[in-house]
Amino acid sequence: MAELGAGGDGHRGGDGAVRSETAPDSYKVQDKKNASSRPASAISGQNNNHSGNKPDPPPVLRVDDRQRLARERREEREKQLAAREIVWLEREERARQHYEKHLEERKKRLEEQRQKEERRRAAVEEKRRQRLEEDKERHEAVVRRTMERSQKPKQKHNRWSWGGSLHGSPSIHSADPDRRSVSTMNLSKYVDPVISKRLSSSSATLLNSPDRARRLQLSPWESSVVNRLLTPTHSFLARSKSTAALSGEAASCSPIIMPYKAAHSRNSMDRPKLFVTPPEGSSRRRIIHGTASYKKERERENVLFLTSGTRRAVSPSNPKARQPARSRLWLPSKSLPHLPGTPRPTSSLPPGSVKAAPAQVRPPSPGNIRPVKREVKVEPEKKDPEKEPQKVANEPSLKGRAPLVKVEEATVEERTPAEPEVGPAAPAMAPAPASAPAPASAPAPAPVPTPAMVSAPSSTVNASASVKTSAGTTDPEEATRLLAEKRRLAREQREKEERERREQEELERQKREELAQRVAEERTTRREEESRRLEAEQAREKEEQLQRQAEERALREREEAERAQRQKEEEARVREEAERVRQEREKHFQREEQERLERKKRLEEIMKRTRRTEATDKKTSDQRNGDIAKGALTGGTEVSALPCTTNAPGNGKPVGSPHVVTSHQSKVTVESTPDLEKQPNENGVSVQNENFEEIINLPIGSKPSRLDVTNSESPEIPLNPILAFDDEGTLGPLPQVDGVQTQQTAEVI
């Protein structure tokens, strides 16, 4: 058995943890096995009740140890799985926190970028609003200054104006429609120098003011505002038409002067209407207001013309301002050619009057001297003022503004044909109702910026033609032809300027559109870049997330494979351990069986020696029949007591020991019965008292007597049954064999 323990320990030496855990239990099992298989010499002095203290069978303890080890391994594996699960959960929690942190950072970054864009957009809007406010304030200041400057010279000119009494006639209101028409031809026929002076008063003074150079440097929008200020309104055109009709019938050179209050109210009503509205809708609203008040203005002006008194005002002379103009006007007049078809008026005038004519013309009003650049409307506007809103609405390229053109006065060379007729104009003023001094007749050849868009030379020619017609000294057809020629030139100039202005506006509009398109393209490009960047970032994050998930999935699969591999290895190790235990058990059983057979052989040898000694003792003794019977009876009683002693400590197996004892003692009884039968049956006391005492003291010695009795009673029972040794794989007979061995040893001793 020591070899078994050593072999078991050597076999378990390669298991590591299993060996360390099961070492104490294996030592206990080994001690129990050693205690159960000690040699017979170690327990020779023990009593018969020694069999009651035998340990439990080793295989039962081995099964408990296996169950306990399996339970411990199972608990250890559960602990490892729980720890691994905790590690997985912690790793997933860290990954989730990292992903949430990444999302928070990205969201914060996008929010900061959006706020930055909002702040930048708000700053741009604020700058734009401030710039618009500054432009608006500057424009309002320019308009205010322009209105102030346009009103001051008008008041001053009203003081310079002079006029005579009008010949009121009832035919003013009943004039034919041709004379009330607004067309250029009809107005040009009845133009009077006084009307020319009135029409050119504000514009000529304003455009010839000292700060003209500074105002010409304004922006295009400001220039358009100033040009609209200088554009004549419908009421102005109505007044001009009425004045032309009156001057044609009365043939008077006296200017008609509107009272200051009426002029001031007209300016205060008309001009704010031009600038309160935005630039795009200003012309349309102005035209609507002007059309609505057209008839009222005509009637009021006619009444004023009829009720105004004849006044005379001396035009103040400013030598510093008029000296260059006089030089421009009169220096070229010495070599001027006469108009074709116009006779030289020399016979009807005395030489003194001819010489006095230049002196009378010398002090002209400021509108006669300087070439005036005037902003007026196009000819089609003047033909039908009622249809003006429709025409303005059909011109989207001008953005609702009325077409404005600039008419420059002709230079000194263009005015040369009308200069020789200034002299004859002086005597024609003698029949006037209000006599005027010689210097006062000079304002007659004033430039006429009338609604017919004629220049100063044309008005001068028309005025002189009308005077000569009354005097019978000038051909009106020639004057009309010259006027038409100058109107044609002026119209061509206007058309040219209009084309240039439209081209300039078109260029500006294209520039604005290109700028807006470029800004929109830049904004679109920025948005596309931002969207592409966001898409790329999202794609990158998605790819990273997919890669991370793939890595985690691969890690989980690898861990699952490792766990399955470890589980398989554990199961294989358990199977190997079970196989090893089974082999050890088989080896153990084989060794026990071998030892049992050896003990059986030793017992047989002992029994043979015992039978030989008994046979020799019986042969030498002389016995009697009564003693033998008595001894047999005594032996039977002792034999009957023997099974009680042997069956009591049998641990619930009382059947096995009698069979074993019987099997071991069968040969003894078989061999001893012939000797007993051969003994002489004699009366008296037997000689074998000492041997009988020995048999009484040793219970094993009484077995042959009991067997003899049983054999004599039932001869059918075989004397040597071998059934007890056929089942060599059972564990039950092993303790009984040990009990038999101890009894036989005691018998031998």
Swiss-Prot record:
Residue stretches of biased makeup (Polar residues): 36-52, 307-320, 461-473, 660-672
Chain intervals with Low complexity compositional bias: 424-433, 451-460
Presence of keyword Lipid biosynthesis: no
Biased composition (Pro residues): 434-450
Residue segments, region Disordered: 1-91, 104-180, 307-688, 702-723
An example Gene Ontology biological process: establishment or maintenance of cell polarity
Induction details: Up-regulated upon terminal differentiation of primary keratinocytes.
Phosphothreonine: modified positions: T231, T277, T673
Residues modified to N-acetylalanine: A2
Domain of life: Eukaryota
Positions with biased composition (Basic and acidic residues): 62-91, 104-151, 372-390, 406-418, 478-627
UniProt crosslink position (Glycyl lysine isopeptide (Lys-Gly) (interchain with G-Cter in SUMO2)): K273, K295, K373, K377, K406
Coiled coil: 89-152, 477-612
GO annotations of cellular component type: axon; basolateral plasma membrane; cytosol; microtubule; microtubule associated complex; microtubule cytoskeleton; perinuclear region of cytoplasm
Compartment(s) of residence: Cytoplasm, Perinuclear region; Basolateral cell membrane; Cytoplasm, Cytoskeleton
List of residues that carry Phosphoserine: S161, S165, S183, S200, S202, S209, S219, S235, S254, S282, S335, S365
Description of post-translational modifications: The association with microtubules is regulated by phosphorylation during the cell cycle. During interphase only phosphorylated on serine. Phosphorylated on threonine in mitosis.
GO terms of molecular function: signaling receptor binding; structural molecule activity
InterPro entries: MAP7_domain-containing, MAP7_fam
Keyword Coiled coil in annotation: yes
Protein function: Microtubule-stabilizing protein that may play an important role during reorganization of microtubules during polarization and differentiation of epithelial cells. Associates with microtubules in a dynamic manner. May play a role in the formation of intercellular contacts. Colocalization with TRPV4 results in the redistribution of TRPV4 toward the membrane and may link cytoskeletal microfilaments.
Subunit structure: Interacts with TRPV4.
Name of the featured protein: Ensconsin
